[in-house]
């Protein structure tokens, strides 16, 4: 009896040990599985952009592809163009900002100076990804993201301003298409011949009726910016050393006069007509024959007539210059996942370079590559690529918005909307602009 009891107790003990071992093994396996899941769990990277509905949809397709290829991150976009600058500035000042965000060249200088953008200088130097090679970027596109010898972001587009023309209207009036010899004089001559009144007379005819124009040769409303014409004439609006605004130089004054004369000429619609009918809409509706717009505007793909894309006419002495409109992306200095955010930043920047016209990298500025990426714009790409070689950007600095506010409201608005004489305004406005620059230098 005693032996049977001992045997029973031994069996119970053995079963208990086996059950305990299984439970421990299950617990260990479960723990290992959880640890593996945590190791492979992606980091959520929040991205803020100003993209509208259509652009956000295209962007999402890019993000879906990147997210599927990455084991590290999952980029989630928050795209809303409404009050973007105000919203992102507020978010970055607090603790609710995104990990990545789109930023204009103008804002980049401000954000970098306020330490809200992550300094990525060393990270770029240590990366072997082609997109991180800063020597491949056009200097005009990279310079807005530099502050005190450090880099705080990368551009994902530099779209030069180009000349869109309605070839059908050129053909109808017998005007030759633009070529490399086009300067201000040839541009004006074409604009006159392309400006038609209700009687079919053009602006170069003595009997032309400027009060009853039905077709205009050109249009402007503050765009294209006057800086383009100042540069083409050998002038500038901010000196290279940021010490002053040389808008009173002979070269600059002549360019302001050229711009004002265009605004007041019959070749350009009145500002009221432009407001009523729509700026680029008038070009699309064949009421304007020539339009200066960004390369990414893609007007050549959005109209029902033969549309050509050309380089801008050069200045009187042959100087070629255009504006390179630069947009880019930065990393929030307060991101909790800087390493992963940087990798997502690089991958997304590279992907946008494949998407947008024109990528700001010299290695991508060749016609064969661009035709593969954008076959629908094959005829426009050479002029765009050529324009990149001499595209310039504004000289941004920390207080640039203050400078630009005075330049716009005190100088350009009166010229455009009130027919003011630039020679009268310039002596009054220059001291105000110089004061902003001197304040920034302190």
Indicate where each model-derived feature is located:
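Short, low-complexity disordered leader/linker segments with a strong preference
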Residues: 1-45, 68, 376, 434-442
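Extracytoplasmic "Venus flytrap"/periplasmic binding protein-like
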Residues: 65-137, 146, 171-174, 280-282, ...
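A structural signal for short loop-to-beta-strand junctions that line the ligand-binding cleft
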Residues: 90-91, 98-99, 130-169, 208, ...
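Hinge/lid segment of periplasmic solute-binding proteins
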Residues: 105-162, 204-211, 308-310, 374-379, ...
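C-terminal lobe and pocket-closing loops
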Residues: 125, 296-304, 316-410, 441
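Extracytoplasmic/periplasmic solute-binding protein
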Residues: 147-156, 161, 185-245
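Conserved C-terminal helix/tail region of periplasmic/extracytoplasmic solute-binding proteins
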Residues: 171, 264, 386-442
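Glycine-centered hinge/linker elements that transmit conformational signals in sensory
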Residues: 190-191, 241-273, 303, 312
């Amino acid at each position: 009896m005693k032996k049977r009891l001992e045997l029973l107790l031994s069996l119970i003990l053995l079963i208990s040990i086996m059950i305990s071992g299984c439970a421990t093994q299950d617990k260990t396996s479960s723990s290992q599985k959880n640890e593996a899941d945590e190791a492979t769990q992606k980091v959520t990277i929040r991205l803020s952009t100003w993209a509208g509905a259509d652009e956000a949809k295209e962007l999402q397709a890019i993000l879906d592809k990147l997210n599927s290829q990455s084991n590290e991150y999952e980029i989630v976009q928050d795209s809303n163009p409404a009050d973007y600058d105000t919203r992102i500035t507020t978010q970055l000042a607090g603790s609710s900002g995104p990990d990545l965000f789109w930023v204009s060249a103008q804002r980049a200088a401000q954000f970098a100076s306020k330490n809200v953008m992550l300094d990525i200088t060393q990270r770029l130097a240590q990366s072997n990804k082609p997109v991180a090679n800063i020597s491949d970027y056009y200097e005009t596109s990279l310079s807005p993201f530099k502050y005190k010898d450090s880099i705080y972001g990368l551009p994902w587009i530099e779209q030069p301003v180009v000349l869109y023309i309605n070839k059908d209207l050129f053909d109808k009036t017998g005007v030759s298409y633009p070529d490399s010899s086009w300067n201000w004089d040839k541009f004006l001559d074409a604009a006159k011949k392309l400006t038609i009144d209700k009687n079919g007379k053009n602006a170069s005819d003595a009997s032309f009726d400027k009060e009853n124009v039905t077709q205009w040769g050109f249009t402007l409303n503050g765009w294209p910016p006057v800086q383009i014409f100042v540069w083409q004439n050998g002038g500038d609006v901010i000196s290279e050393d940021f010490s002053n605004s040389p808008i009173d130089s002979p070269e600059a004054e002549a360019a302001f006069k050229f711009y004002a004369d265009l605004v007041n000429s019959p070749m350009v619609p009145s500002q009221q007509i432009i407001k009523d009918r729509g700026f680029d809409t008038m070009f699309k509706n064949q009421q304007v024959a020539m339009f200066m717009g960004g390369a990414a505007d893609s007007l050549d793909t959005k109209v029902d007539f033969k549309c050509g894309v050309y380089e801008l006419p050069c200045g009187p002495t042959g100087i070629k210059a255009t504006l390179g409109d630069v947009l880019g992306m930065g990393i929030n200095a307060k991101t909790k996942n800087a390493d992963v955010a940087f990798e997502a930043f690089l991958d997304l920047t590279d992907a946008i370079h494949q998407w947008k016209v024109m990528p700001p990298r010299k290695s991508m500025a060749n016609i064969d590559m661009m035709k593969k990426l954008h076959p629908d714009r094959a005829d426009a790409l050479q002029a765009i690529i050529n324009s990149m070689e001499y595209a310039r950007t504004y000289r941004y600095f920390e207080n640039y918005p203050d400078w630009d506010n005075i330049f716009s409201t005190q100088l350009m608005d009166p010229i455009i909307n009130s027919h003011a004489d630039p020679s009268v305004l310039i002596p009054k406005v220059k001291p105000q602009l110089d004061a902003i620059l001197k304040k920034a230098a302190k």
